[in-house]
Every structure is written in structure tokens, then in C-alpha cells.
């Protein structure tokens, strides 16, 4: 099935942002974007990705979309939008349905962090995955590439979660959407908009 969505030809009809793939495999978002290019599948990079907008753009040939959350810090949002423009992103996907973070019980139970903390349980787990460890040691991308440099101290999921809970703006309105649209000036897709 082929279709066109905001001027992008694609062979599938659904599209979702990719983030944290860099925790599963070194440079995971870059690899996902390259695979998407190879197979003609659209790619959208998440704000909360391990690889930055610039990292993905430097390792791909086709434009990709960038997914954005509305946060209270408008200077940060404006800077992200400018970075997406500079990287040649062809559309901005504005997420509307994540203004209040849910509890990810498995992540809390497993004490998931990025990069992994060196606990005895994690050391045993990593010892059984030498290929993953070698890949992670070889890459420079181990943190949230789109957040680092703005939010000091955001180096694992629990600090990112606290920062996000403080930054995600539950008072999201159509005025905010208009502000993002004016900042972006390009193709804008609203994600998470439903009729009730």
C-alpha cells in the first residue's frame, strides 16, 4: 500500500516516533533510520532518543520527521525546532497525548537507566552479552542526545522522568500548537489527536 502524507511518499500507512533504540543497540536510532531508508519506510525520530537529530541526519541521505513534545521551557522547544530545521527534517510531528507521564512499572521494577548503572545484577546481565557491551563501549552515543546540553543532570531514565514530569505542559492548548506551527514554518503533523 502506497500513500502520500504531507508530501512524503510512503509504503505504509502508520508512523510512530523511534526513541531509546540506542539503548537496545549502539547507535540504534541511526541504524533504524538507515534501515527505514533502505526499505522505503518512513522514519520519525523521537525527542527522547539516544542519538541526536544531528547524529541521524549525518548518517542518512533522506529527510526524516522529528517528533516534538510541548514543554514549559519554550526556549528549549524553539532550539529543538531550529535544530530539526537545520538537520533538514521534512516534517514535525507534534505529540499531543503525553502531557502527563504514566508509570512504566517494568522500567521502575527493573531500575532501567541509560546508560546502565553498574550494579551487581547489571554486571552479571552484561557479562552474558559481550557483543552488546562492545558496541556500547565503542559508541559515543549513550545518553539522550536531544536533551543533553539543556537539562543538566539528565543522564538516566529516573532523572529524565523527573525532568520530563516537570517540563511536560499539561495546559497544552491550540495556542501552543499555533506557536509551534509559527516556529516551525513547515509541514506539521499532530499526533495523538482523537475525537471523544
Mark where each language-model region is:
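Glycine-rich active-site/cofactor-binding loop and its immediate structural neighborhood
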Residues: 13-48
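Short, flexible active-site loop motifs that bind/organize anionic cofactors or intermediates
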Residues: 1, 67, 167-170
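Short glycine- and Lys/Arg-enriched binding-loop motifs that mark or flank ligand-binding interfaces
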Residues: 3, 24, 188
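Hydrophobic faces of well-ordered beta-strands that scaffold small-molecule active sites
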Residues: 13-16, 43-45, 64-68, 92, ...
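N-terminal start-of-chain detector that recognizes signal peptides
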Residues: 15, 37-40, 64-66, 159-163
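A gly/proline- and charged-residue-enriched helix-loop-helix capping module
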Residues: 38-59, 63-77
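Single conserved hydrophobic/aromatic residue that forms the stacking wall/gate
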Residues: 1-12
Amino acid at each position: 500500500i502506497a500513500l502520500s502524507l504531507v508530501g512524503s511518499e510512503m509504503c505504509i500507512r502508520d508512523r510512530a516516533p523511534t526513541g531509546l533504540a540506542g539503548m537496545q543497540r549502539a547507535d540504534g536510532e541511526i541504524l533504524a533510520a538507515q534501515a527505514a531508508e533502505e526499505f522505503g519506510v518512513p522514519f520519525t525520530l523521537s525527542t527522547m532518543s539516544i542519538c541526536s537529530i544531528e547524529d541521524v541526519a549525518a548518517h542518512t541521505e533522506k529527510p526524516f520527521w522529528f517528533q516534538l513534545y510541548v514543554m514549559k521551557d519554550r526556549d528549549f522547544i524553539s532550539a529543538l525546532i531550529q535544530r530539526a530545521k537545520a538537520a533538514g527534517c521534512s516534517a514535525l510531528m507534534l505529540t499531543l497525548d503525553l502531557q502527563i507521564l504514566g508509570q512504566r512499572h517494568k522500567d521502575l521494577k527493573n531500575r532501567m537507566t541509560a546508560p546502565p548503572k553498574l550494579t551487581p545484577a547489571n554486571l552479571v546481565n552484561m557479562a552474558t552479552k559481550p557483543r552488546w557491551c562492545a558496541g556500547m563501549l565503542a559508541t559515543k552515543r549513550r545518553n539522550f542526545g536531544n536533551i543533553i546540553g539543556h537539562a543538566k543532570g539528565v543522564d538516566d531514565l529516573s532523572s529524565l522522568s523527573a525532568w520530563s514530569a516537570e517540563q511536560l505542559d499539561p495546559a497544552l492548548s491550540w495556542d501552543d500548537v499555533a506557536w509551534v506551527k509559527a516556529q516551525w514554518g513547515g509541514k506539521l503533523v499532530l499526533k495523538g489527536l482523537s475525537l471523544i
